[in-house]
């Protein structure tokens, strides 16, 4: 969650301006999940780390939204990118995915844009770190690009650079001889001599 500084799936942040509280919503990992993921921070530990007012289980999110809707309060959300988030917004607010782009809050969009134009020292450190990793990703791709190597091999090595530095790719790596196709995914085709190859990658 960008505003909460937490990197874990299955969390929702609700900033309730009217009631002056910040909710961290999600479920604690149970014993069956620990077998798969190992020990992780509890919801309370994450709440303390990010400074949220309180935590609630995920089942409470619908109630939080319903209470706000019943009082005719405006619920602000950004235009969703992922399909699972579009479905979640539809379930919570009744806004169909086709209508979500225009229903998104322009007030919140402008606030986010304004806030993101100013960086704290920690954010600048992360940006500089990502730039160094991105440089290594691109120079690795340049070094490996030669006839007979597959697009998938090079893109796999490029992704591995990000992971080896404890980062993740900022988007699926684009590495293709078909640069005319936007967001072209790497294939098992071998690189051919004299062909132009497009690489777009980042951490």
Kindly give the residue locations of the regions a language model identified.
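Short catalytic-site patches enriched in acidic/histidine residues
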Residues: 1, 106-111, 149-203
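A composition/biophysics-driven feature that prefers long, compositionally simple stretches
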Residues: 1-136
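A broad detector of the eukaryotic-type serine/threonine protein kinase catalytic domain
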Residues: 113, 139-143, 180
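Short, charged/polar low-complexity linear motifs in solvent-exposed/disordered segments
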Residues: 40-43, 144, 201-202
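Active-site pocket-lining segments that scaffold enzyme catalytic pockets across diverse folds
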Residues: 119-143, 149-165
């Amino acid at each position: 969650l960008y505003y909460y500084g937490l990197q874990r799936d299955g969390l929702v942040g609700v900033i309730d301006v009217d009631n002056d509280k910040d909710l961290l919503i999600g479920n604690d990992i149970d014993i069956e999940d620990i077998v798969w993921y190992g020990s992780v921070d509890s919801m309370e530990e994450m709440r303390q780390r990010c400074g949220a007012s309180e935590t609630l289980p995920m089942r409470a999110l619908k109630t939080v939204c319903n209470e706000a809707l019943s009082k005719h309060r405006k619920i602000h959300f950004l235009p969703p990118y992922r399909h699972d988030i579009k479905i979640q917004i539809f379930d919570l607010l009744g806004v169909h995915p086709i209508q979500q782009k225009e229903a998104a809050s322009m007030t919140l969009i402008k606030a986010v844009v304004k806030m993101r134009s100013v960086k704290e020292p920690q954010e600048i450190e992360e940006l500089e770190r990502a730039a160094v990793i991105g440089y290594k990703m691109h120079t690795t791709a340049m070094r490996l690009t030669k006839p007979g190597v597959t697009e998938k091999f090079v893109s796999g090595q490029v992704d591995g650079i990000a992971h080896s530095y404890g980062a993740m790719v900022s988007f699926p790596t684009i590495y293709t001889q078909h640069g005319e196709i936007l967001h072209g995914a790497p294939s098992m085709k071998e690189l051919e001599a004299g062909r132009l190859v497009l690489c777009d990658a980042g951490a």
